[in-house]
Every structure is written in structure tokens, then in C-alpha cells.
Amino acid sequence: MTHIVWRTRDDNPWLSMAKEVVLKFLPPPGEDALTCGPGPFSMADEPMVRKMMEIAGYRDITFRRVDAPVLVGKTVEDAIGFQLAIGPAGEVFREAGSQAEAKRAEIETAMAAAINAQKKDADGIIMNSSSWIISGKNPS
């Protein structure tokens, strides 16, 4: 089996930065929030994932780090729309409902400032990402 997962929040500012901006204006989702699951970083911890795979019967487990740029939008407006639609920032924004809509202009202004500080090239706004490619064999 081979799968790819995100590494830590710190290794993936393209997802974590936007959430940090949104949390300056909105509360984090509560325990009963309708979230999208354990989150994109739930398998970032190599020792924990290795142990889970071993318990499931996998052997010859390898982790290979892959760092790569990711396009978050062709324009700042595209990037803001992307960040508020998916991922950790989008989840906080959706869960806040009318409170988020009331603060949308402030949030978008703050997010635009953060996004404008990122690298830009001919394709758009580029940010760093980091993943694990995890492989293992299950002899059974």
C-alpha cells in the first residue's frame, strides 16, 4: 500500500496561514461542529502512523518527505476564494455562519495582506507544501 498525506501545519503554510487569519476574527469550531473529519494533518506524525500501520499488519514501512510548491490561486481574489471554500480556514468560516458573513470584508482584507506577502510567478500565488509518501507491505 502506498498513500500520501500532509505533513505538519508548520510544513504547510498554504493551509495553516489562512486558518490563522480567520481565527483572528472568528471562534474555532466547537466540539459538536460539523467538521470534515479529523483534519488534513491527522496523519502527519510519523511515529504514530508507523505504529498504526504495524498494528494493522504492515511491514517494511517507509516515509518519504516530498516538499513542493502549490498554486493557491491565479490572483489574490482566487486564493481567498479557495481558502474560504476548503481546508481548515474554510471549515472555521463555514461553521461560524452568519458571524463569518458579517466579518467577511475584514477577513478578506486580512487574508489579502497575508496572501500578497507570498511568492508570485507567472501562474499565480505559490506557497510551500510538504507531504509524506508512506508505503508498506501487508503479507497477509
Question: Residues of each region from the PLM?
Answer:
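Amphipathic alpha-helical surface "interface" segments used
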Residues: P38-S42, A102, S131-S135
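Intrinsically disordered, low-complexity coil segments
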Residues: P28-T35, S98-A102, N138-S140
